[in-house]
């Protein structure tokens, strides 16, 4: 099982073996010294070159590696710790703790390369995953075991929504979450850890980080590390898990780097020729089974805002819902800044949601769309030139817009107002009332930053006083 390093080209390392040939994806361990410090490096077999030579991808920096160093094939792929002990801790791609906390003995390890659940075990039920966030549950609901794309520029609130979802899953569904930082900025990973600590959600989430400064192997495989931890919660503990990936684009990007390093001929826009199959293999593992489910929320960076770029276009094929954050909405002070007209979901179907929910959702969208169409007239001629019917539409649309805002639990520290979880029934009832004109006499301000409609009524009473 011992081999010798024969070539080092940055993150690509060739290893020669005599009487043993490691399988593709098998892990190889190397110990070496740099400036008197002993380092352990894991390599993953990517190609067989013939003559018992394998080409591997390094999972960490390869500085200090030299030809002739001894390498040991481990006989199995990279395996990472799983189970409840991983909660509240930060791991790197090979499952080592990197949070400088106390050491833990993990009794269970799973390989990061796994097959998706067989068809007969997969659940075919279309169920809604209640998040407690009004705008999401009403207009672009998430599917249990589905995949959601979270689109938004910098500073619009992607991280806050992710943290609120982790909070609501922990407290309402008493479920666990896994966060995979794929090609994240180290600063963002650090901020997220401290924000979670302050918001008291850390003990319900496992964090896996492969930062921007790490080699492509680590940035690519970190997504599999996180997914493996989530699969254990689903398959062995029968839980509904939430899996966050930030950012799924970096998964494709690091795959392209690895592909080029291995000498494969690039495909469109320089991406790897295996882009669609790599993404498919990964996304197929995120699914509902009869035991439990993994619902994933994936932040998607769109290079140069070009939605036809192969990387985001490949992700779209797998998504069940999209939550689009809009800077213009954030500038109005409406948080979460989810765009009610741009966000979509395949769950928005009367056969899944029921006629009532569907009608209210479509009614809300129709009113908001009409308001959007009237904005030019209002800007040029003012409100007085509108017909009575249009004035009423604008009035209701402005109330709906404000009622789509909501105080978050994880933002209590900044806003000073306590967070609210709104159940689906209360959510539908509130918006139905606005559409039916029940609350036409109430001031707009009563609907801003409240939970359910009863709170809006109480706020209106306060404003009167």
Curated annotation (Swiss-Prot):
PROSITE patterns: ATPASE_ALPHA_BETA (PS00152). It comes from the Bacteria. GO terms for molecular function: ATP binding; ATP hydrolysis activity; proton-transporting ATP synthase activity, rotational mechanism. GO terms for cellular component: plasma membrane; proton-transporting ATP synthase complex. Keywords: ATP synthesis, ATP-binding, Cell inner membrane, Cell membrane, CF(1), Hydrogen ion transport, Ion transport, Membrane, Nucleotide-binding, Translocase, Transport. The keyword Transport applies. InterPro entries: AAA+_ATPase (IPR003593), ATP-synt_VA_C (IPR055190), ATP_synth_F1_bsu (IPR005722), ATPase_a/bsu_AS (IPR020003), ATPase_alpha/beta_chains (IPR050053), ATPase_F1/V1/A1_a/bsu_N (IPR004100), ATPase_F1/V1/A1_a/bsu_N_sf (IPR036121), ATPase_F1/V1/A1_a/bsu_nucl-bd (IPR000194). ATP binds at residues 152-159. It is found in: Cell inner membrane. Produces ATP from ADP in the presence of a proton gradient across the membrane. The catalytic sites are hosted primarily by the beta subunits. This is ATP synthase subunit beta. The lineage of its organism: Bacteria, Pseudomonadati, Campylobacterota, Epsilonproteobacteria, Campylobacterales. The gene is atpD.
């Amino acid at each position: 099982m011992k081999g010798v390093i024969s070539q080092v080209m940055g993150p690509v390392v060739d290893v020669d073996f005599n009487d043993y040939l490691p399988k593709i994806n098998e892990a190889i361990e190397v110990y070496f010294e740099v400036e008197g410090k002993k380092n352990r490096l894991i390599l993953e077999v990517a190609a067989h070159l013939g003559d018992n030579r394998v080409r591997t991808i390094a999972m960490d920096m390869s500085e200090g590696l030299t030809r002739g160093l001894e390498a040991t094939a481990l006989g199995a792929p990279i395996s990472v710790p799983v189970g409840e002990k991983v909660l509240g801790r930060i791991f790197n791609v090979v499952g080592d703790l990197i949070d400088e906390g106390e050491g833990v003995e993990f009794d269970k390890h799973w390989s990061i390369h796994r097959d998706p659940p067989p068809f007969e075990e997969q659940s075919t039920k279309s169920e809604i995953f209640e998040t407690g966030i009004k705008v999401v549950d009403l207009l672009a609901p998430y599917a249990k075991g589905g995949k959601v794309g979270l689109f938004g520029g910098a500073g619009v609130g992607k991280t806050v929504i992710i943290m609120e979802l982790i909070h609501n899953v922990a407290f309402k569904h008493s479920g666990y979450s896994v966060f995979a930082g794929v090609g994240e900025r180290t600063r963002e990973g650090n901020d997220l850890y401290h924000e979670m600590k302050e918001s008291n959600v850390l003990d319900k989430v496992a964090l896996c980080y492969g930062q921007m400064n790490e080699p492509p192997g680590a940035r690519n495989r970190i997504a599999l590390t996180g997914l493996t931890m989530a699969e254990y919660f689903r398959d062995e503990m029968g839980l509904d898990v939430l899996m966050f990936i930030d950012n799924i684009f970096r998964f494709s990007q690091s795959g392209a780097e690895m592909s080029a390093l291995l000498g494969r001929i690039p495909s469109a826009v320089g991406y790897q020729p295996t882009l669609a199959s790599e993404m498919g293999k990964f996304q197929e593992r995120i699914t509902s089974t009869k035991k439990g489910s993994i619902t994933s929320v994936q932040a998607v960076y769109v290079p140069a805002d070009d939605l036809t770029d192969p990387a985001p276009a490949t992700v779209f094929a797998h998504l069940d819902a999209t939550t689009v954050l809009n800077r213009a909405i954030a500038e109005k002070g409406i948080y979460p800044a989810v765009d009610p007209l741009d966000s979509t979901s395949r769950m928005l179907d009367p056969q899944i949601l029921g006629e009532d929910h569907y009608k209210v959702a479509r009614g809300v969208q129709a009113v908001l769309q009409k308001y959007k169409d009237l904005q030019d007239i209002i800007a040029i001629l003012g409100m007085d030139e509108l017909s009575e019917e249009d004035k009423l539409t604008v009035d209701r649309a402005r109330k709906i817009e404000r009622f789509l805002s909501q105080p978050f639990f994880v933002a209590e520290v900044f806003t000073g107002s306590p967070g609210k979880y709104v159940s689906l029934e209360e959510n539908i009832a509130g918006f139905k009332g606005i559409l039916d004109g029940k609350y036409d006499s109430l001031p707009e301000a009563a609907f801003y930053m409240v939970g359910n409609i009863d709170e809006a009524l109480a706020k209106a009473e306060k404003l009167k006083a």
